[in-house]
Amino acid sequence: MSGVADLVWVGAALADAGLVTSHGGNLSLRDGDVIRITRTRAMLGRLTPADVVAVPLRGDDAAPQRSAGASSDLPVHRAIYAAAPEARAVVHAHPVTAAALSLALGEGASFQPV
């Protein structure tokens, strides 16, 4: 699979598993000095290659990337890649169960995954 095809497949897999809802979340992968990232408002379960844009790995998080339609979470993806040079991809999802648990536990609470 190509990198973009991988992102399309992962988006569908997340949706099929019920881990994302409609427009909740975004995906990216590092490709050398480029990040391939889903567009703002892309539906992860229905991604097409046109929903993935290429932006520089490093750069200003302002106008050029916004005009390309990159996810508004691009600065977060860049920060993760900068902090973890070995990271090849970022999956940002909002599983309903995790969101519900965080609301039930309250701010600052922690829990152990099972």
Model-derived features: positions:
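Glycine-rich flexible loops
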Residues: 1-114
